[in-house]
């Protein structure tokens, strides 16, 4: 998906659109935790390793991203906290019973 996004970003810049291409790594979830555990590493250590590999690969492929962000970045965490607080304050987050597929 990053290569496709890069293609779109390059095209958008070529036709004169103001373009900001953000990419990065999602470092949360059970898969990351399990992969770290099987390697005898902490989740953060494993995320650091994998994120570094992705960033190096994107640089090698000359991906034209403007910013590489990780879900473990302090900046990202702060942004998520602000967004969730706004949703909570508006009443968009609440406890209830849910019926559905997920």
Question: Where is each model-derived feature located?
Answer:
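N-terminal, positively charged nucleic-acid-binding surface of large information/translation enzymes
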Residues: 1-102
């Amino acid at each position: 998906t990053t290569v496709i996004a890069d293609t779109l970003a390059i095209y958008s810049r070529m036709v004169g659109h103001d373009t900001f291409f953000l990419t990065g790594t999602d470092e949360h979830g059970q898969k990351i935790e399990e992969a770290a555990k099987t390697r005898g590493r902490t989740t953060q250590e494993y995320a650091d390793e994998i994120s570094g590999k992705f960033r190096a690969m994107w640089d090698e492929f000359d991906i034209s991203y403007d910013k590489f962000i990780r879900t473990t970045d302090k900046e990202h965490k702060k942004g998520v906290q602000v967004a969730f607080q706004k949703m909570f304050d508006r009443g968009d987050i609440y406890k209830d019973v849910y019926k559905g597929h997920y």
